[in-house]
Regions:
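Acidic/His-rich structured neighborhood in mature extracellular/periplasmic domains
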Residues: 62-196, 240, 249-252
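Sec/Tat signal peptide C-region and signal peptidase I cleavage site
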Residues: 16-20
Length: 284
C-alpha cells in the first residue's frame, strides 16, 4: 500500500503522519516505530505459537508501560498509534494487533497500523469521532465478524445479561467531541440502539469461582460495569500461573501495565463498579 510519509517536529518530539487509503492519517512518533521493531524482534522466535500464547508473550513485553488515559482524544480524529503509554482497552487492542502482525512473513509497521484501524474503527474506516468503536461491546462484535476472536462467555458458564446502552448519549458533557455536537450525539444514539438489540451474556461475580476453570490464558477478559447504560468498566488479558487465574492489564491503581498480583476472583470481588466478566477467545 502506498503511503506518504510526512515528518515534522512538535514540542513533544518527532511526529510522523502516514496517509493510508481508507484509514485516514495515522498519528505516531519515531519512538513508536522503534518500539514496534523491538517487540517484533523479541517475539520473532514465538511467531508460530497459537494466538492465545503469542498474545501473552506480546503482553509481557509491555509490563511497566505507563497508564495514560485519553491518548486518542486529539482533534481532528485520526488513527493514533502509541506504544509508549496506554490505557486498558488500548493495551488489549495493541497486543492483539501486534500478535497478528508478528505472524506475518514480513511484519511491518504499516501492517500493524492497518490492523489497528480494523480493530478500532467501524469497518476499519476512520471517519470522524463517531466512527471509532467507543463501546467495547461493538468492538467485540466487529472483531468477531472479522474473525479475530469469538465471545465464549455463555460457553464458560455465563448467564443472560440485560445490557443497556445509553451512557454516552445521556452524558455528552463528559466527551468534548459530543458536548457541542448534537449531530455526533445523534450518531452515538443510533449505535446504542443497534447494540441494544443484541443479546449479551456475562459471568456474575458470584459465579466466577465456579466458572474460572473454563477461562484460558490469552482470553480477553471484559469486566462488566454497574454504571447504568455503560457496558464495560475494564479489560485485560487472562493469565494462568500454575493453578491461579489472574490477568495482565493496564492498571489505574498501579499507573502502569502489570500482572495483577491477586487472582481474578479476588480482584473483582473488591471492585464495586464491576458486576462480572465477559470472555473473548482469540482465534488460533
Amino acid at each position: 500500500m502506498k503511503r506518504t510519509i510526512i515528518l515534522f517536529i512538535a514540542l513533544f518530539g518527532l511526529v510522523i503522519s502516514a496517509s493510508a487509503t481508507g484509514k485516514g492519517d495515522a498519528r505516531f512518533t519515531q519512538r513508536d516505530v522503534d518500539r514496534f521493531n523491538e517487540v517484533m524482534s523479541a517475539v520473532s522466535a514465538d511467531r508460530d505459537l497459537p494466538m492465545d500464547e503469542l498474545i501473552v508473550k506480546v503482553a509481557r513485553q509491555f509490563l511497566g508501560t505507563p497508564y495514560v488515559a485519553g491518548t486518542l482524544e486529539q482533534e481532528p480524529e485520526r488513527l493514533t498509534v502509541n506504544l509508549r503509554e496506554t490505557d486498558c482497552i488500548l493495551f488489549v487492542e495493541m497486543c492483539l494487533a501486534l500478535a497478528l502482525t508478528a505472524k506475518d512473513d514480513e511484519p511491518s509497521f504499516n501492517s500493524y497500523i492497518d490492523r489497528l484501524a480494523t480493530l478500532r474503527y467501524r469497518d476499519g474506516v476512520v471517519d470522524g469521532y463517531t466512527s471509532r468503536l467507543h463501546y467495547t461491546s461493538e468492538w467485540i462484535v466487529q472483531g468477531g465478524v472479522n474473525g479475530f476472536f469469538k465471545e465464549v462467555t455463555k460457553e464458560c458458564g455465563g448467564s443472560p445479561l440485560a445490557q443497556k446502552f445509553s451512557f454516552m448519549s445521556t452524558h455528552p458533557s463528559s466527551y468534548k467531541q459530543l458536548s457541542n455536537s448534537p449531530a455526533n450525539v445523534s450518531k452515538i444514539r443510533s449505535v446504542e440502539q443497534d447494540l441494544q438489540s443484541r443479546s449479551y451474556w456475562y459471568i456474575p461475580k458470584a459465579s466466577l469461582a465456579a466458572c474460572a476453570k473454563n477461562i484460558r490464558s490469552g482470553d480477553i477478559i471484559a469486566f462488566t460495569s454497574t454504571v447504568a447504560g455503560l457496558d464495560i468498566a475494564h479489560i485485560g488479558i487472562a493469565l494462568r500461573q500454575g493453578d491461579t487465574l489472574t490477568f495482565i492489564h493496564a492498571s489505574t491503581s498501579a499507573d502502569k501495565v502489570i500482572i495483577n498480583p491477586t487472582p481474578l476472583t479476588q480482584y473483582i470481588s473488591g471492585v464495586k463498579s464491576q458486576s462480572g466478566v465477559r470472555v473473548i477467545r482469540i482465534n488460533k
